[in-house]
């Protein structure tokens, strides 16, 4: 469907499609105030600004209820819990059971299910993410989960409007890359938290695990621009080296950096068991 074809739908049909993209009544209502949309770019811009500026915790939580549980044994086994969660298709029975338990623990702690944009992620990676995020506070998880929902929303836009032009979408404003200089290879499966100061306390606003190339290409949702400020990237190098039975002098690496505008910022880490360095990448 093209955007032009979508704009010809009735308001009821258009709203239903939006609800399928993001299950927040407030978000859909605010989006429909601008229907029909002028362009794909306007649609994405509105989706982002409405989500972050005109929705609140109750709206975010409502959207979470429209997702199946990634860790639900039955849905994992029978349906693999939806298209965005296709990465769990190769999961072993043990991994599925572990996901089920971790998801239950997560829901019991935070009061909503684990939300993650699972496209391209393996079941093992999702389990690692889930276990890592279980250590966060409720405030942190709300920030992270709403960001994951926004990623999912944009993916669903593309699936809804298959003939539309989304070429304008850029990569995450903040990206990272880890290189293990001891072996000259990417640092894969390293848990990374991105944090900002809120009321004088560092809180996680995005979280991920480096892929086989040592990168997290989707740390933030596309078109999500952070306000110019000081941020921090926290790398769990201790667990990375522990998995390899290697002792490291640096169990955790923290890199603070400034953003000044809406430009792309790349924060790489070059690390070995006894030293590390960073620079502003491109």
Q: How does the language model describe each region?
A:
Residues 1-10, 16-21, 26-102, 152-160, ...:
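Aromatic-anchored, charged helix-turn/loop surface patch used as a conserved interaction hotspot
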Residues 115-121, 236-238, 272:
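Short, loop-centered acidic/histidine patches that primarily coordinate divalent metals
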Residues 31, 114, 267:
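Residue-level signal for inorganic ion chemistry
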Residues 263-282:
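Compositionally biased low-complexity segments at domain edges in trafficked proteins
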Residues 89-161:
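C-terminal non-catalytic interaction appendages of large macromolecular assemblies
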Residues 114, 160-167, 278-282:
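A general structural signal for short secondary-structure boundary/capping elements
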Residues 166-260, 266:
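Beta-strand-dominated extracellular/periplasmic modules and repeats
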Residues 24, 36-40, 120-123, 135-139, ...:
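Alpha-helix boundary/capping and short turn/kink residues
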């Amino acid at each position: 469907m093209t955007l032009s074809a979508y704009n010809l739908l009735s308001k009821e049909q258009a709203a239903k499609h939006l609800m399928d993209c993001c299950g927040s009544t407030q978000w859909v209502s605010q989006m429909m105030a601008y229907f029909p949309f002028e362009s794909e770019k306007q649609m994405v811009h509105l989706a982002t600004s409405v989500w972050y500026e005109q929705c609140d915790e109750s709206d975010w939580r409502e959207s979470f209820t429209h997702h199946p549980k990634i860790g639900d044994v039955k849905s994992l086994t029978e349906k693999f819990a939806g298209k965005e969660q296709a990465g769990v298709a190769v999961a072993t029975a043990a991994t599925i059971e572990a996901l089920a338990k971790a998801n239950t623990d997560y829901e019991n702690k935070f009061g909503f299910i684990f939300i993650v944009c699972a496209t391209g992620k393996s079941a093992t990676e999702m389990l690692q993410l889930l276990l890592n995020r279980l250590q966060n506070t409720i405030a942190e998880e709300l920030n992270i989960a709403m960001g994951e929902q926004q990623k999912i929303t944009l993916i669903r836009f593309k699936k809804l409007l298959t003939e539309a032009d989304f070429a304008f979408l850029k990569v995450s404003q903040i990206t990272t890359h880890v290189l293990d200089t001891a072996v000259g290879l990417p640092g894969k499966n390293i848990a990374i938290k991105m944090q900002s100061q809120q009321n004088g306390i560092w809180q996680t606003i995005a979280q991920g695990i480096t892929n086989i190339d040592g990168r997290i290409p989707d740390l933030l949702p596309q078109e999500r621009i952070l306000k110019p400020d000081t941020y921090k990237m926290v790398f769990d190098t201790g667990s990375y080296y522990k998995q390899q039975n290697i002792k490291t002098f640096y169990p955790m690496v923290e890199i603070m950096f400034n953003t000044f505008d809406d430009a792309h910022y790349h924060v790489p880490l070059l690390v070995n068991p006894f030293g590390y360095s960073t620079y502003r990448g491109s």
